[in-house]
Amino acid sequence: MAFVRKKIRTFKWPVNVEEPADGGVFDTSTFDATFKRLGRAEFAKLSTKGDYDLLKAVLIGWDGIDDEDGKPIPFSIEALKEFSDDSYWVRGVLTAYTKTFEGAREGN
């Protein structure tokens, strides 16, 4: 199959967020992120600036994030800024994004 370079370089990918719970276990929750594909140079540059700048560049949407009352939290820069203070959430998002690179390496 031929490689087709697409103008719109986004993709949806599942994100697992593992948070510590009582009893020495982790609770895992999942949501779907919409990521923007970055070029290697842009990714490397943003990686040195910090998690929030990287998140702002790669995460452009989500589905499946609710508040405590079960209401969906729509994606926004304000919501992203709030979530970026949660180290478990940030780890889940960045792990999911970088995992796509690993899959590309393994398959090629």
Model regions: which residues?
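Short, charged/polar N-terminal "headpieces" of proteins
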Residues: 1-46
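Acidic, low-complexity intrinsically disordered segments
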Residues: 45-108
